[in-house]
Each structure stands twice: as C-alpha cells, then as structure tokens.
Amino acid sequence: MSKSESPKEPEQLRKLFIGGLSFETTDESLRSHFEQWGTLTDCVVMRDPNTKRSRGFGFVTYATVEEVDAAMNARPHKVDGRVVEPKRAVSREDSQRPGAHLTVKKIFVGGIKEDTEEHHLRDYFEQYGKIEVIEIMTDRGSGKKRGFAFVTFDDHDSVDKIVIQKYHTVNGHNCEVRKALSKQEMASASSSQRGRSGSGNFGGGRGGGFGGNDNFGRGGNFSGRGGFGGSRGGGGYGGSGDGYNGFGNDGGYGGGGPGYSGGSRGYGSGGQGYGNQGSGYGGSGSYDSYNNGGGGGFGGGSGSNFGGGGSYNDFGNYNNQSSNFGPMKGGNFGGRSSGPYGGGGQYFAKPRNQGGYGGSSSSSSYGSGRRF
C-alpha cells in the first residue's frame, strides 16, 4: 500500500508548533522552509485577528509522522534569517497538564508491574530515541518495586513524541507516561519566565496568552477549588470535584487530604490507584516528593507563575483560521480569574500566596515578552 493509499495517522501526531518566528514570516515562507521535509497538509502563522500582526508562532502539519520525524531530525531550523523552535504540538486536552509545554528529557512511567525489568522498558522506549538512564524505583526499606520508573533520553523530542501518544504497553501491561518534572525544573521554569520581560505570554499581546486576549476557558480556573496541590485539597487537577482523570475525587494532585497521592484516595494512595500502599505518584516521597507534604501547589515563585495573565491558546482555535487546536469551556490554563492553577499555595512559595500555575497575580508568563 502506498503512502497516498494508507489511512492517515491522527492529525495531532503530524502537527508541529513552530515558535520564535520572525514577525516578517508569512504562511508562504514558513511553508517553503518546512516542505523540504515532506508534504504539508496545513501551514499557518498565527495572527492577531484585529491587527493581523504575527504573534510570533505558527503550526505546520505534515502528511505523515515520518515526515515530522524528518523535520525534527533536521534541527536547528532557520526561517527568514531567524532560528525557530519546532516542537510537537500539544493537544488541547494535554495542554492543561502541568508542565505540558516544558522542555524535558525525562519521563515518568507509572503502573508498571512487579515483573517488569529494565530491559522491558529499554526494549519499548528505545524506539523513540537514545536512552541515557532507566531507573525503576524501589522502596528503600523493603527493596520492593514501587510500580513506577523514570526514563531519561538524550533529546527532549523523544519525550514530546512519547507523551502525545495516549497508550503505551510495556511487558504486556498498559502504563501511564508523562513528563517527569523535578522541583528544580519547576523552579527554573518559574525563574526563566521572570527573566523574560513583562506581562505578555507566549506570543501574546497585552496580557494575552499564547494566542490572544481571552483565557483558555473563561469561567474559572482549571483546577477548581483546591487546585493542583492546593492546600485545602478541595478540588482536583481536573475540576472542582474530580481528581486527575477521576483518580481521587476529593483532593488535588498531592493535596492536603485525599487526592492524587493524598491520604485516602487517588493515584498511589492507600486505597486505590497506581502504586497502592501509599506509595504512588508523589506519595511517601516518590516522584521527587511532588506534594511536598500537601499545602504547596505546583506553581512558581511568589508573584510570578507559569502561565500568567492569559492562556495557552485562548483566543480561539488554533485556527480561528480553521483547525481545532483551541480552548475548552470551563477552566482556564493560566487565567486571570481569582483562583490560580496552583490553588491556595505554591510549590516554591509561601503557602496561600495566591499565585499558582498561571494564577491571577502573575507579572510574567509562559514564554512572556514578545516571543521566544
């Protein structure tokens, strides 16, 4: 079966975000550069709908994933005299996850079974790129495997490619894969945003975000009452009453009470979820002690957060210009509403200081300033 006859791979896997564009770059010049590596089914420079001025980023979509890989393997790219940053486009759903837009080389692999060894992980994940380190986590006291591992690659694109694919099977078992974000990476993300000048977002204008002036989903912050690791544990990473994907109904990700690795429910809690017996993702000191004992959210330093005044793609669809890379209703990624993404407290801040992951008091933001 020829390429043209084969069924198309999902669009999300064929799409690249291109950041750091010159304001002179047009759809045509972007296309003429990136079509060197394959057939483009879509190519757009995102523009302000009123002024028509470039926002400094765009998207290209190839006909096949193989062509996307070829383009990424050809980095660095220079378009109209400016070095640009291509990354695999993050879906609307995944853009809500903490650290979705961070560049990291390590993944967390959860839900792996007792009989899974290092070679099983290597056999599966080496298809995505060169592996540097594999760590299967064990209990310090008993030596028993804790049900999760970390895999470090030599290139962030390997991680980006892995996390946009929803399902992974290692040693015959389904597992959950996400970016591994250490405390240091979160701190450096926060400080790097502070150093990037001002109140704009990733290509945004006046307090606007990654794509404009509204928030990712108007109507309230993404994490509901308690927020991501919020001190009250009232809301989950996924809404006011839900935990992450339904894990841990009553608390946030590492929240004070129950929740995602909280005391009684959630991912890795004593009752149910990955990694049971209180050891799961973030529980009992695992995954870099993400919950930090509860009370601290996942955000940045005191007044500055990872998402600032606007949001990831707030103004409309990646494509008001004709595609679906757009907002969701009911929750903003980095919105200006009163409840920040990090709940009452922050990961590296005083408890309850009101600036969370993209919270309301931000003066800096995700890729703030004009653009990269």
From Swiss-Prot:
Q: Which disease is it linked to?
A: Inclusion body myopathy with early-onset Paget disease with or without frontotemporal dementia 3: An autosomal dominant disease characterized by disabling muscle weakness clinically resembling to limb girdle muscular dystrophy, osteolytic bone lesions consistent with Paget disease, and premature frontotemporal dementia. Clinical features show incomplete penetrance. Amyotrophic lateral sclerosis 20: A neurodegenerative disorder affecting upper motor neurons in the brain and lower motor neurons in the brain stem and spinal cord, resulting in fatal paralysis. Sensory abnormalities are absent. The pathologic hallmarks of the disease include pallor of the corticospinal tract due to loss of motor neurons, presence of ubiquitin-positive inclusions within surviving motor neurons, and deposition of pathologic aggregates. The etiology of amyotrophic lateral sclerosis is likely to be multifactorial, involving both genetic and environmental factors.
Q: How does it assemble?
A: Identified in the spliceosome C complex. Identified in a IGF2BP1-dependent mRNP granule complex containing untranslated mRNAs. Interacts with SEPT6. Interacts with C9orf72. Interacts with KHDRBS1. Interacts with UBQLN2. Interacts with PPIA/CYPA. Interacts (via the RGG-box) with the HOXB-AS3 peptide; the interaction inhibits binding of HNRNPA1 to the intronic sequences flanking exon 9 of the PKM gene, preventing inclusion of exon 9 and promoting inclusion of exon 10 which suppresses formation of the PKM M2 isoform and promotes production of the M1 isoform.
* Cellular localization per UniProt: Nucleus; Cytoplasm
Keyword field? Acetylation, Amyotrophic lateral sclerosis, Cytoplasm, Disease variant, Host-virus interaction, Isopeptide bond, Methylation, mRNA processing, mRNA splicing, mRNA transport, Neurodegeneration, Nucleus, Phosphoprotein, Repeat, Ribonucleoprotein, RNA-binding, Spliceosome, Transport, Ubl conjugation
The name under which this protein is listed is Heterogeneous nuclear ribonucleoprotein A1
Q: Where is the composition biased (Low complexity)?
A: 360-372
Keyword Cytoplasm on this protein?
yes
Superkingdom is Eukaryota
Q: Which species?
A: Homo sapiens
Function according to Swiss-Prot or TrEMBL = Involved in the packaging of pre-mRNA into hnRNP particles, transport of poly(A) mRNA from the nucleus to the cytoplasm and modulation of splice site selection. Plays a role in the splicing of pyruvate kinase PKM by binding repressively to sequences flanking PKM exon 9, inhibiting exon 9 inclusion and resulting in exon 10 inclusion and production of the PKM M2 isoform. Binds to the IRES and thereby inhibits the translation of the apoptosis protease activating factor APAF1. May bind to specific miRNA hairpins.
Q: Glycyl lysine isopeptide (Lys-Gly) (interchain with G-Cter in SUMO2) crosslink: positions? A: K3, K8, K78, K179, K183, K350
Specify the RRM domain's residue ranges: 14-97, 105-184
Q: Among the record's GO biological process terms, what is one?
A: import into nucleus
